[in-house]
Amino acid sequence: MVYNNYMPYIVNNQSVGHHPNEIKRAPSYIEFFEKIGNSKENIVVVSNFLSDKEIDYLMSHVDEKRMVSFVSQKDNEGNPTSWIHNYEGIIDKYNIFKKILDQIKKSYNYQNIKPKYTSLNIARWDAGTKLSLHVDDLGYLTENHIPALVYLNDDYEGGHLSFPTHNLNIKPKRGDLIIFPGNMHYPHEVKEVVSGTRYTLSVWFTIPDML
């Protein structure tokens, strides 16, 4: 059995990404990995992180003309199992990247972190959408070291963020931020959106090589 040409990493009898031993990591990544450990406390929820004004600005960019749809997960045969719709290229008018980065550095007491992108993207999750168990930095992209999600609405059913190895299920409120390590200790899934539409601001941060 292989995952994207690698041996898979198995959690709860599911392939959740490449096996960690198959991926070469930089010393800076290893330093961060060892520093934070595998505590449940590394899953951080910050209530009311964004203001109504900031959320309204982001949601004003939910425009079908700028929507890009993509396959977010495939089965072992390469068939699409989940689609996400993104609204891309949003100008960071309110310095949201910096706000999130400052919070991450504070939460993990670690400074060598940078955002992967320079513009913001909103993900739309329609009813019926879900994301099966996976690990962010063991997937097709292996540099998604720290994911951050800001919830832009809460008027939907389902769509919980679940960390089964930590016995944790989260359905945040509008404006809340969630950050967590993207490594092997934090496999997670998004439960099916039962009704309504779920909107999130999804941002990834990386641990760059130290010069």
Residues of each region from the PLM?
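Catalytic core of non-heme Fe(II) oxygenases with the double-stranded beta-helix
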Residues: Y94-L211
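Non-heme Fe(II)/2-oxoglutarate
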Residues: V2-I113
